[in-house]
Curated annotation (Swiss-Prot):
It holds the Pfam family UPF0175. This is UPF0175 protein APE_0276a. It comes from Aeropyrum pernix (strain ATCC 700893 / DSM 11879 / JCM 9820 / NBRC 100138 / K1). Belongs to the UPF0175 family. InterPro entries: UPF0175, UPF0175_domain.
Length: 89
């Protein structure tokens, strides 16, 4: 879904891919997100949005795929802020 700061693209794929009916778009989004993250083109947040997954689901997917984390200082600060807020509750 295109929104602020995003762009919609259309691609053609060959018929006969071994993907269950109705799963093609989801599978392509996940594969694209994984590869863009793996190559350092997309951040964790950008990649998980492309994949349509929560941060934690995307982290689990990265682990299953054997893709190491590219954890930036900014992401660490964000996670520490969340942890502090949760600890205060």
């Amino acid at each position: 879904m295109a929104g602020i700061g995003s762009r919609r693209i259309v691609i053609e794929v060959p018929e006969g891919l071994r993907v269950p009916p109705g799963e093609l778009e989801k599978r392509l989004r996940i594969e694209l997100a994984l590869r863009l993250y793996e190559k350092g083109i997309a951040s964790l947040g950008q990649a998980r949005k492309i994949a349509g997954l929560s941060k934690w689901d995307f982290l689990e997917l990265l682990a299953r795929e054997g893709i190491p984390l590219h954890y930036s200082e900014e992401e660490l600060k964000e996670d520490l802020e969340v942890a502090k807020k949760l600890a205060e509750k």
